[in-house]
Amino acid sequence: TAILVQDRPVLGGNASSEVRLWILGATSHMGNNNRWSREGGLVDEILIENLYRNKEGNPVILDTILLEKVYQEPNITLLLNTAVWDIEKADPQTVSKVYAFCSQNSTFYEISGRLFCDASGDGILAYRAGAAFRMGAEEKRCYNEQFAPDKGEFGELLGHSIYFYSLDTGKPCLLYT
């Protein structure tokens, strides 16, 4: 059994309708624009279903597909609009509990478990647990990565963005306001 805690109202992170970045993965690793690369597994399953059901590329439809995938898995409990804000440790090396709060229904959650994965994007669980972390992009010399940037090649942190697009589908479409 897993509990998926998401601090936003939709799943997908940067690929959600809130941010609207497309799922790239291997197809654009380090900006190489490899048109022959393709993600496999669950990502491929989601992308194929999105292509089939969402010919216009509406980001809200992708949100729905992601939500359906989670609901189809009986061993996942989903907590949307719920942010982890603190942790408890069983010992100096072991997280035993996370504390979360849902802003939509003012509910506090105390979640116990044996394994926790921080995929929040901001690393709150890892930070509260005292894990080592870094901010920004590491230079090539840090890990001897061939395609990593030299210092100063791009910004150290991601900026904010707003993204609009339009598409002539050749037929009437729903207008979201």
Locate predicted features.
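Flexible, active-site-proximal loop/turn residues at the rims of small-molecule/cofactor binding pockets
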Residues: 20, 104, 122
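Glycine-rich loop(s) and the adjacent beta-strand/alpha-helix scaffold that form part
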Residues: 118-173
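N-terminal Rossmann-like FAD-binding beta1-loop-alpha1 element of flavoenzymes
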Residues: 1-2
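Short beta-strand segments that buttress and anchor functional surface loops
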Residues: 97-102
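Conserved N-terminal/central alpha/beta ligand/cofactor-binding core
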Residues: 6-93, 134, 143, 158-164
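Core beta-strand elements of the Rossmann-like FAD/NAD(P) dinucleotide-binding domain
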Residues: 106-115
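Conserved small/polar residues in nucleotide/adenosyl-binding loops
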Residues: 176-177
